[in-house]
């Protein structure tokens, strides 16, 4: 019995629908996956129109804490920040992410640290 025409196309469509919509629209910088809403404000610096906790939740799903270590780097009245380490960084790729909240400006930013070549 011959395969049904369009079978492969239908299988591909089903596979694409199984992928969450946000996974298709994520941004990549030096190999690091950032939230799709990230807006570039400088070299390797991005502003995200989400809360600090929402951005950390995004990174927990993309970069699990078991594999990507986190450490607090600031917790002051004006800034709260955490560093996410990439244990598999190669030259030219992301070495770490600094996620920080500027409390006075009520915004969350991401700084992508790139390993030197």
What positions do the PLM features span?
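Bacterial N-terminal signal peptides
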Residues: 10-19
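An acidic-aromatic pocket/loop used at catalytic or ligand-binding sites
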Residues: 5, 20-117
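Bacterial N-terminal signal peptides that target proteins for export
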Residues: 1-11
């Amino acid at each position: 019995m011959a395969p049904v025409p369009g079978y492969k196309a239908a299988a591909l469509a089903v596979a694409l629908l199984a992928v969450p919509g946000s996974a298709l629209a994520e941004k990549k910088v030096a190999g690091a996956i950032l939230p799709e809403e990230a807006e570039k404000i400088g070299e390797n610096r991005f502003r995200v129109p989400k809360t600090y906790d929402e951005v950390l939740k995004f990174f927990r799903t993309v970069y699990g804490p078991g594999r990507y270590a986190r450490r607090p780097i600031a917790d002051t009245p004006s800034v709260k920040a955490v560093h996410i380490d990439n244990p598999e960084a190669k030259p030219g790729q992301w070495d770490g992410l600094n996620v920080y909240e500027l409390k006075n400006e009520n915004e969350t930013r991401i700084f992508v640290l790139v390993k030197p070549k």
